UniProtKB/Swiss-Prot annotation:
Disulfide bonds: none
Enzymatic class: hydrolase
Family per similarity comment: Belongs to the peptidase S66 family.
Keyword Hydrolase: yes
Pfam families: Peptidase_S66, Peptidase_S66C
Organism expressing this protein natively: Rickettsia conorii (strain ATCC VR-613 / Malish 7)
InterPro entries from the UniProt entry: Carboxypeptidase_A_C_sf, Class_I_gatase-like, LdcA_N, Peptidase_S66_N, Peptidase_S66C, S66_fam
Keywords on record: Carboxypeptidase, Hydrolase, Protease, Serine protease
Name of the protein this chain belongs to: Putative carboxypeptidase RC0549
Gene3D superfamilies the record matches: Class I glutamine amidotransferase-like, LD-carboxypeptidase A C-terminal domain-like
Amino acid sequence: MILKNISLLIILFFSISTFSAGHSLKNISITVVAPATGADNKTLSDLKNINGLNLQISSKCFAKGKLPFLASSDEVRFNCLRDALFDESDNIVWSLRGGYGSARIIPDLLKLSKPNKEKFFIGYSDITALHLFLSQEWGWKTIHGSNIADLLKPEQDQGNFTKLAEILKGKVKQVTIDNLVPLNDIAKSSDLVNGKLTGGNLTMVQTSIGTSWQIKTKGKILFLEDVNVVPFRLDRELLHLKQAGLLEDVKAIIFGSFGKDLDATMLVLRNFADSLDIPVFKTNRFGHEKINDPIIYNTNSKIIKSKEFKLVMGV
């Protein structure tokens, strides 16, 4: 009886959370794309059945190809993304989930001319590759934020979607990331840092090095996050960015979550921060954990200090 009641409470919590997020996105037409890993039919059906959501999900974009970890073949994923980006009837393109595969279709994206209409493009994790392309090649202000399938995850803070909805509906002129903790002395003594934002998932940022879509960091505020990263791997990837010269002209670095923030992970981040002559901060307000506040690429932003440090972005 107790187990049954617990199960009912879990189902009720999930239903309320999903309804709340769905309500904040009510009447917003959203084109869902799967440029990386896909989802099973139940996941797609559950998304379509969330009350108030207006999701455009094309079944042809989920025809499995040879590789089971991709939503479909490279050709199909590219075509579906291209069609969504160029369709002038919708304003929002939202990635289903991350996983793997976005980098595989960038060579074809590079052959395209920039569309006449700029759209909201949302996603994170593996989708970082597309953020770098769209912000650097087309000059778009894309949004690093929860993938649409995260609506079905009860462990996710549904406030992530409320904040995204406020941006999409034009209700806010700026968004903020609070609780920036300075990791080195330069950060502690900083009062103001100005710059546009770039970055995203550390693994994907590292993957971009040496490619046609390599991250451009000069004069930018760099934000980085990842998931389940063991300390030595984290140190190795950060060292790669440094030795590749990508941190030489960075205005500041903001680290998001990297898992459970074990003591060893924080030791790596603090040690790395001390090796740099730029401000470095840490927050748990974005990444693969419960809270994933939106961050806007390519927009005028600033790190300011009042009672605490915070990142303020224009919309």
